[in-house]
Structure formats: C-alpha cells, structure tokens
Amino acid sequence: MEFNHKSVMLYEAVESLNIKPGGIYVDATAGGGGHSFEIARRLHEAESSSAEADIFEKSDAADAFDKRNTHSGKLICLDRDPDAVQAARKRLETFSNATVINVNYSQIDEAVKQLNIDEVDGVLMDLGVSSFQLDEAERGFSYHADAPLDMRMDKQGKSAADIVNNCSEQEIADMLYKYADEKYGRRIAFDIVKARQEMKIETTGQLSDIIASAVPAAYRKNHHPARKTFQAIRIAVNEELYHLETGLAKAFELLKSGGRLSVITFHSIEDRIVKQYFASLCQGCTCPKDFPVCVCKNTPKGRLLYKKPLIPAKEETESNNRSRSAKLRTIIKL
C-alpha cells in the first residue's frame, strides 16, 4: 500500500531540532517517514562531516576513517498507525541508525527506554492527519467519499460509528463544541440523533449528508459543512488531546539540557494546548509582586526558540493547501 504524504514545514521543522553529530532524535509522529528521512539524512551528513574533519586533524587517519563509518547518532520513529510504520520502515531502510516502533507517542518514554536510552537531543511532533489517512477512503476520515465510518488511527477502541450511534445528543453537542468550536453543534447533534432513530449511521456519506442538512445554506459556501464535525469526532475517537498532553510532558522530560521539542499544530485547540504548556515551562517566579523575596522557588525549565510560531511559506501553502493552518513551535530545555 503506497503511503503518499507531503510533510508540512519539512525544512523548518528539521532545522529547529539543530541536528548534530552523535545526537539522538525522536520523530514521535513518523507517518510515512518524510520528516524522519530528512532528520536521518542530516544526522548522517553531520556525522560524515565530523569524521572527515577528524581525518585532517588527527595523525591516525585510519582510526578517524573507522569513526566516519560508525554512526553513533540515532533516530527513533514512532507511530500508532501500522500502515504508517510499514511505510516509514521502507522509506528509512537505507539508514542503519533509524528504528521505527509501532506505538503512540504518549508512550514515548517507554519506547525510548526499550532501546536503553535515558535522554534525547530532540523530539518532533507533527499533529496533522496524513494525506494517506485522509485520502484512503476506507479509513473513514474523509467527508469527500462514502466509506465505513471508522476514523481509528490504530484500529483499536471505539470507531466513529460507535460514537455517533451511541452517544447522547448532549454528549455529541459538547464534543463538537469542545473539539471543534462548531457553532451549529446543537443543531447537528439533534439531527444526528433524529437520523439514527430511523437508520444506523454507518458511513461517512450518511453523516456528511446529515450535517449538511442541519446547517444554514450560507455555512456551506466557503468550507465543507462537515469539516469541523469530522475533526471533533476524529479527536474523540483517537483521544488525541489526552495523548497530546501526555506526550508533551513525557517528551520534554526526556530532553537533555539544550535539547529541543518542536511541535507542528493544525487547529486552534491543539495549538492552544502546546502554547500554554510551553508558556508554563518558561515561567519563572509566580509570587505576588509585593513579596520581598521569592517563596515559590519556581524557575524556568525552558525557553522558546521563536517568540511567535513559524508558519509555512507562501510557496508551500500554494502547493499544499493542507499546510495553510500549520504552526511550528519549539522549546529548548534549560
């Protein structure tokens, strides 16, 4: 199965990690291996350049040449999607220092410890759904095709159909508000419950039609009316925000001093979580201003690489419209 996906902000993301010889890096959301490949390539390039320099600096050229062919740097790639793991392994097969593991990035600490690694130099998280997952109709992520209503990244747990057919009207409305800021959430939830009383909702086409009929005609002009609802259900199915909050904390904990955590977000809800978490790590004393001395003992644990998030270049958004909402944030551990 061909895993076609164009990595968003490829060079900006990899550049933010500051790849260095002998470094240990984690691509926590490997997908088809686009970012992973570039990290592995730069790691190989950095180590080769370092070894070349040794040849000229050291009298024992043979020893330096041996070091050039022994790569101490490592790349660990994680993904919860078995199809993505298979694609990443194929993409990275030429890099002996790359390891691909089928696991959710919220378990990054366990995955790294399995390899007897205690700390890393950098972690990258790309929170977007891959083009492969969106375009492969049978995965049930897309509202552009009629397919089984699934949306599971790893084929475990409840599917989108389970949620749509079993959650109460209030639960569905709350989900649409919390995970997508859908202003017509109550209308949509009402119509979903009404429709499922007549026939079980089993396909993306059914759900998309129900949503389209629930919202005003004006709402259907600029964007597909099902866009936000599908986002909210996908987030709920895969417990994305729980995994994000857990993964962020574990990834930062794994970093060496000077290590970097870079995260690419695609919607305001996940970006808010990343922004607030990074801000909490950068915060120093929280004592009231009128306290003569600090009693909280709180010191900053990190600093932002950029004050504001990076966004894709115009050329990228024009060639890949799925990159339009992307934001890249990076924090450096102190």
Per-segment meaning from a language model:
Residues M1-L334:
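S-adenosyl-L-methionine-dependent methyltransferase catalytic core, i.e., the SAM/SAH-binding region
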